[in-house]
Amino acid sequence: MKKTLTLLPAILLTTWLGCGGNQEATAPANTGVNGENAEKTKGIIAYTPQTLSNPFFSVIGDHIRAEAEKNGYEILIVDPDYDVKKQSDQIDDFIAKNVTAIVLVPCDRLSVGPAVQAANKAGIPVFTVDAKCAADGVKIEGHVGTDNFQGGELAGKAMIDALGEKGGKVLILDLKRAHSCVLRVDGFKKVINAHNKEAEGKIEVVSELDGNGDRTKGYQSTADALQAHEDLDAIFAINDPSALGAYTAVKEAKREAKIKIIGFDGQLDGKQAIKDGKIYADPIQHPDKMGKQIVQLVVKYQAGESFEPETLIPATLYTKAEADQDPELK
């Protein structure tokens, strides 16, 4: 396949965004596309995640960009910041620009449906990465994501290990509008329920609250739960930002010595928190592989090649043992 990368780099404008608390993240946003230049490439791959303030989605975007450029495509990246209407408007703009393909992480697995249908009608293929679109009447050409149910099972096993034989009371910080996060909680509960059938020390989920996948809401929901449940023993958060927000609330309440936190993602700051003893463990995802593989599906689609409609990448459990050997960490 002839490469056109040497002819034209993708035109990128970047916005630096912070995610709640003291976390800082870098991410490309509102990537410009020059019509004249686009004609010299194979086309435009457009990416709209849930947010770019979460480094996880930024890493996916970085690898989408790299793989797209490698294969001769321009890249257009925008940031809806968890706003479903904004994301729908962005998809409408992609349609107006007649992009080659849309890569989507739905802000809401159902509400984004009409915008996806509009792209379908315009003949623009839509692919999802990380989280699926569950709306009726939409056509998604391919999906690449973590095996989130399996990752949730790993989180459940880590929780059993963290609490030991005595069991304990658990808060779940969820994000129900994201299908991937629903699967994580389902996998977690499956393992916990199976454990409770056999174990003398039960693990009881006493509260499920929206953590919104960010530090701010993770902190607020945890603070509320700590007031309502003075005997709380542990927290399972569906991603690292909400887990780190939970830790801040736990520390403010001076209960960090007792309460164990299980996160999810394996972002750099999450891994560092595991090494520092703030988070017990993370099932980690591989956003680099997601970004690369979703573009490979787009390339195959454009070439008329066959491919599996769904690719699930297994999560792996990351504990302090791994963190202590991780050269990326301090």
Language-model features: locations:
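Positively charged n-region of N-terminal signal peptides that target proteins for export
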Residues: 1-4
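Bacterial N-terminal signal peptides
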Residues: 8-16
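A residue-level marker of the well-folded mature domains of exported/periplasmic proteins
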Residues: 17-330
